A protein has these predicted regions:
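Short intrinsically disordered terminal tails
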Residues: 1-3, 61-68
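N-terminal acidic leader/helix
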Residues: 2-30
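Intrinsically disordered, low-complexity serine/threonine-rich segments
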Residues: 5, 12, 40-42, 50, ...
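N-terminal non-cleavable signal-anchor helices
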Residues: 9, 47, 67-68
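Acidic, low-complexity, intrinsically disordered interaction modules
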Residues: 20-55
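Short, intrinsically disordered terminal segments enriched in charged and Pro/Gly residues
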Residues: 52-64
Length: 68
């Protein structure tokens, strides 16, 4: 597996589920370890194997740095 991560940003109006799903798809397609982005004050690092539901749950619990 690659040790590279790519930082991205999403446009206004994108839901967290959409952002996490697209980040996971891009990480898999590009063969990178993580796609990184911020969403409403929380940092996300999303791997190709990311559990989207876990990411949403951790965000709803108030976590500020979420690696999935």
């Amino acid at each position: 597996m690659s040790k590279m991560s790519i930082k991205v940003s999403f446009t206004v109006g994108v839901s967290l589920r959409e952002a996490l799903t697209e980040a996971r798809e891009k990480a898999e397609k590009l063969g990178v370890a993580f796609i990184e982005f911020s969403f409403n004050g929380a940092f996300f690092a999303v791997s190709p194997q990311a559990d989207i539901e876990r990411g949403i749950e951790e965000f709803e619990k108030g976590m500020k740095a979420i690696v999935i």
